């Protein structure tokens, strides 16, 4: 329990929505605990340190899912065993040091791969407690920070990855990936579907356009899914793509078995009430799906963390990879016409899911911060560096 004033600095990143969602889940949970002696601040380090360059990198990252997959693949898989090699290792260093001097946090929590943190721990002798929340299901070297005291990971397999990379087992906790508590709450599926003017007795296929990737061809997929699985109904989530939503609404306006939605705050209800989901394998989305035990189809996952997530879920029997829309349509047909297979997949997910991840992480963070040193004892060489180089 925190009995004196303490501060947590969360370093996150806005490359995709997942890292920010994880951060917000943790912040919300800590706020709900009404800890009067604890303050929590969060910073998008790279965006604040280099806004123009980071904005360019974000656009490249988003477009890499469509146009530069091989380039991103080479970047993601380059020198996997050289843990200290990263071309952006010093990116954001001055900003990070300024944050430490200004805020004097008692603990740093990373929800985004931040290689620059290793510079502080190795070269500047920072001994402030550092904890990391990994937001995917397979380890990548950029998540490793020397002298970090805690890694919160999704599964035992992820823990084994970290141990193999040299991280002590005692530093790693299998908590699951943090998601909102509402994904643990009971949902009346029949009531929800009836409210949406859908038939609760029919299999519901949930499709998500996702933040990145394809934005065309969904009309073809919906038509063919309904043709091959005529007893099904489809819910299409278009996200923030107004053009996609408008186009699909026009095409399916007279079909009562199809609902077209834009951005929604009700993914929890839709996941809980559907039998199958077609989605991109982002760490947060599939963690929410795992919590709701909804089997998933991963449509043409991008090389890198998405593909690794998809491989992992497929190996565990939680989902299937479809390289093309036609392959996805065939998988939907096979699964909706084989109810027993869907039940087996859901049962495997139920056995494997880790509940209340955010609560577990926050409880452990409070234990870590309760044993942290006083601020004037933890900053090593940073003040001297800052005096001469940091403005």
Swiss-Prot record:
It is found in: Cell membrane. Pathway: Glycolipid metabolism; diglucosyl-diacylglycerol biosynthesis. It is an enzyme of class 2 (transferase). Signal peptide: none annotated. Its EC number is 2.4.1.315. Gene3D superfamilies: Glycogen Phosphorylase B. InterPro entries: Diacylglyc_glucosyltr_N, Glyco_trans_28_C, Glycosyltransf_28_UgtP, Pro_diacylglycrl_glcsylTrfase. It holds the Pfam family MGDG_synth. GO terms for molecular function: 1,2-diacylglycerol 3-glucosyltransferase activity. It catalyses: a 1,2-diacyl-3-O-(beta-D-glucopyranosyl)-sn-glycerol + UDP-alpha-D-glucose = a 1,2-diacyl-3-O-(beta-D-Glc-(1->6)-beta-D-Glc)-sn-glycerol + UDP + H(+); a 1,2-diacyl-sn-glycerol + UDP-alpha-D-glucose = a 1,2-diacyl-3-O-(beta-D-glucopyranosyl)-sn-glycerol + UDP + H(+). GO terms for cellular component: plasma membrane. Processive glucosyltransferase involved in the biosynthesis of both the bilayer- and non-bilayer-forming membrane glucolipids. Is able to successively transfer two glucosyl residues to diacylglycerol (DAG), thereby catalyzing the formation of beta-monoglucosyl-DAG (3-O-(beta-D-glucopyranosyl)-1,2-diacyl-sn-glycerol) and beta-diglucosyl-DAG (3-O-(beta-D-glucopyranosyl-beta-(1->6)-D-glucopyranosyl)-1,2-diacyl-sn-glycerol). Beta-diglucosyl-DAG is the predominant glycolipid found in Bacillales and is also used as a membrane anchor for lipoteichoic acid (LTA). This is Processive diacylglycerol beta-glucosyltransferase. It comes from Staphylococcus epidermidis (strain ATCC 35984 / DSM 28319 / BCRC 17069 / CCUG 31568 / BM 3577 / RP62A). The gene is ugtP.
